[in-house]
């Protein structure tokens, strides 16, 4: 019997795990997910690293070594995160080889405090890429206005990029433009375009979480009927943008030079509302050439009881437009929602990063006292 995760893979969906820790690497649980549940990549973010590093004792030895070496807290966090990502890259190397680098990818994010600093982001992206030193790493850069320039510049250096925290269709268009500009510059710089890979991480469940609150406040039957629909509608229309902008003459010239399209990646795919089906943002977002990065709980639910019925994206464009129009008619501002979500998303990552630095600083101090 074919498992639901295999069915997703057969439908053109690449399954990535939205989590990474040293424990997963050392105990073999990540390898098991590759072997049994069709996982072909990993994404990380500041919140994931904060949870990994501050729970358990997996990082105590490294922190003690860094303390003895006199490393700063930033140097220690950099060493820990890049080591885990490099080890994960090695684990996924056979997948990368089998897919010519399309999958087998491991993402690591630039310091989120640099989200509004173009030059700082470019420098950090290069630093991370050099330190990890693996062909299958993706450097995550947030899709802020300042980040767009950094995305282009990083790709122009031949570095593969995961563009993160995309919420709006307008910003997604700008992301694809930044990607194609980066490839055009990379070509001019003499890079092999077939070796430059990118995904655009479009966040899904957070859109519903915010819009559902506003629908509840309105409270009418018409409003309640729209709950749980905005996130899917937004993502489906993003795929329509993807189809449009990778069918242009501009893209055809890049493709002739060996370029591969920047794939849409569905992020934030765990349901926030427990009344919704736990596989909602997986089985309802099936389309050729997409990535779906899932927390393990969502992955397990999909493997256990996900119902895959083929492409559930391209046949839903009319309904998706109708959903967004209905929200607008109720006075819910799409632009207001997506701007708020970008701001909140960045704030959450910055807060997690600062908490991580504070916790590691305390651990370094304790290690120095113990020695």
From Swiss-Prot:
<feature type="active site" description="Schiff-base intermediate with substrate">
    <location>
        <position position="140"/>
    </location>
</feature>
<dbReference type="InterPro" id="IPR013785">
    <property type="entry name" value="Aldolase_TIM"/>
</dbReference>
<keyword id="KW-0808">Transferase</keyword>
<comment type="similarity">
    <text>Belongs to the transaldolase family. Type 2 subfamily.</text>
</comment>
<dbReference type="InterPro" id="IPR018225">
    <property type="entry name" value="Transaldolase_AS"/>
</dbReference>
<dbReference type="GO" id="GO:0005975">
    <property type="term" value="P:carbohydrate metabolic process"/>
</dbReference>
<dbReference type="InterPro" id="IPR004732">
    <property type="entry name" value="Transaldolase_2"/>
</dbReference>
<keyword id="KW-0704">Schiff base</keyword>
<dbReference type="GO" id="GO:0005737">
    <property type="term" value="C:cytoplasm"/>
</dbReference>
<comment type="pathway">
    <text>Carbohydrate degradation; pentose phosphate pathway; D-glyceraldehyde 3-phosphate and beta-D-fructose 6-phosphate from D-ribose 5-phosphate and D-xylulose 5-phosphate (non-oxidative stage): step 2/3.</text>
</comment>
<protein>
    <recommendedName>
        <fullName>Transaldolase</fullName>
        <ecNumber>2.2.1.2</ecNumber>
    </recommendedName>
</protein>
<keyword id="KW-0570">Pentose shunt</keyword>
<dbReference type="GO" id="GO:0006098">
    <property type="term" value="P:pentose-phosphate shunt"/>
</dbReference>
<comment type="function">
    <text>Transaldolase is important for the balance of metabolites in the pentose-phosphate pathway.</text>
</comment>
<keyword id="KW-0963">Cytoplasm</keyword>
<dbReference type="GO" id="GO:0004801">
    <property type="term" value="F:transaldolase activity"/>
</dbReference>
<dbReference type="Pfam" id="PF00923">
    <property type="entry name" value="TAL_FSA"/>
</dbReference>
<dbReference type="InterPro" id="IPR001585">
    <property type="entry name" value="TAL/FSA"/>
</dbReference>
């Amino acid at each position: 019997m074919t498992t639901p995760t295999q069915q997703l893979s057969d439908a053109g969906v690449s399954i990535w795990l939205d989590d990474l820790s040293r424990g997963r690497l050392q105990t073999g649980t990540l390898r098991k997910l590759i072997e049994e549940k069709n996982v072909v990549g990993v994404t990380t973010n500041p919140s994931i690293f904060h949870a990994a590093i501050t729970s358990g004792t997996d990082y105590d030895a490294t922190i003690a070594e860094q303390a003895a070496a006199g490393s700063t807290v930033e140097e220690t966090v950099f060493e820990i995160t890049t080591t885990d990502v490099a080890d994960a890259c090695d684990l996924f190397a056979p997948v990368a080889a089998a897919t010519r680098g399309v999958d087998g990818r491991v993402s690591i994010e630039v310091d989120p405090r640099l989200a509004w600093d173009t030059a700082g982001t470019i420098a950090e992206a290069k630093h991370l890429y050099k330190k990890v030193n693996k062909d299958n790493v993706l450097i995550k850069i947030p899709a802020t206005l300042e980040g767009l320039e950094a995305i282009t510049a990083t790709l122009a250096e031949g570095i593969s990029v995961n563009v993160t925290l995309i919420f709006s269709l307008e910003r997604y268009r700008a992301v694809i433009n930044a990607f194609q500009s980066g490839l055009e510059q990379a070509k001019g710089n003499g890079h092999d375009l077939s070796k430059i890979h990118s995904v655009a991480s479009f966040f899904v469940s957070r859109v519903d979480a915010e819009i559902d609150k506003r629908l509840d406040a309105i409270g009418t039957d018409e409003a309640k009927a729209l709950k749980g629909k905005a996130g899917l509608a937004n993502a489906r229309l993003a795929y329509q943008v993807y189809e449009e902008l990778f069918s242009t003459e501009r893209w055809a010239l890049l493709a002739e030079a060996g370029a591969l399209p920047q794939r849409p990646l569905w992020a934030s795919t765990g349901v926030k509302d427990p009344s919704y089906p736990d596989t909602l943002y997986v089985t309802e977002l099936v389309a050729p050439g997409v990535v779906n990065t899932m927390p393990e709980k969502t992955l397990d639910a999909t493997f256990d009881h996900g119902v895959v019925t083929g492409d559930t994206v391209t046949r839903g464009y009319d309904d998706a437009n109708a959903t967004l129009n209905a929200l607008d008619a109720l006075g819910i501002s799409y632009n207001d929602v997506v701007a708020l979500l970008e701001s909140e998303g960045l704030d959450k990552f910055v807060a997690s990063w600062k908490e991580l630095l504070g916790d590691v600083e305390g651990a370094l101090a304790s290690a120095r006292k113990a020695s």
